[in-house]
Amino acid sequence: MPENECNLAKERVVRSETPETTCHACGHDAHMAMCLTAGRILNSHKDELEGIIYLCFEEGEENNTGWPAMLKELEKYAIDAVWGIHVWSAMDSGTLCVQPGPRMAGMSWVQPHFHGRGGHGSRPDLSINPTICAANYLVNAATAMTQKITAGETVTCGFTSLKGGVVGNVIPDDCKVLGTFRFFNMEEGKKAVRLVSDIAEHTAAMYGCTVDELPDLDEIIPPTVNDPYIAGILEDAGSSLTFLTRSLRSKAGSCTSAGMTMTP
């Protein structure tokens, strides 16, 4: 993100060559420190423990995720359970939440690329305007989410960008829509992927355009759903700790869920 942190507790020691474009602000430096510290503590008690613990450091989250390569590497090991942790600003500092059930949302990207035929703005009749097509797609897709998702379920669809031409009197050849949707029910998430893809194709056909870069069912990041048994162990172990708390589930996505797909 093109911003700089303004709430550092100490003077910055490490500086990027492009500091104005390197802020992510999800606290991943904290995640790295937490995992390293946990590994150091566990290693100091290795003579008292059984089994093998693998520490996993993901190189990205949501976009540019490192989970696919990590899962491929972990396939050679017999993984019994996955533990992931994410800092969250909505919780009080010094608290920990280990509730069972859905905790963080599944997600998929929406980025249909509409192709038309450009021309001069004075003669739209001689062009196939992908901007009009993309704008109508936004309305169609947003409306469909309120009508086609199962009652009682929620799929949050956030459209964030519509990129077409760069001047006011030239109709572009292409126009691209960007966005994301989040869900806690995997089947509803798959339904949403199929829905926005179908709407993109039908809207493109209606305006004489073509469309590609539709979302793929295989690229969906599933929701993070804590196993009741594992979460129960953690809650029981920490029942005497005053910093255990309960928190609302988050619509932010976490690739920890991808790791959970490889466990019993």
What are these regions (language model features)?
Residues 132-264:
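Metal-dependent amide/peptide-bond hydrolase catalytic core
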Residues 32-39:
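DPxDG-like acidic metal-binding loop motif
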Residues 25-26, 258:
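Hydrophobic transmembrane-helix microenvironments that flank and shape a buried ionizable site
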Residues 2-23, 29-30, 42, 47-172:
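Histidine/acidic-residue-rich, glycine-tolerant segments that coordinate divalent metal ions
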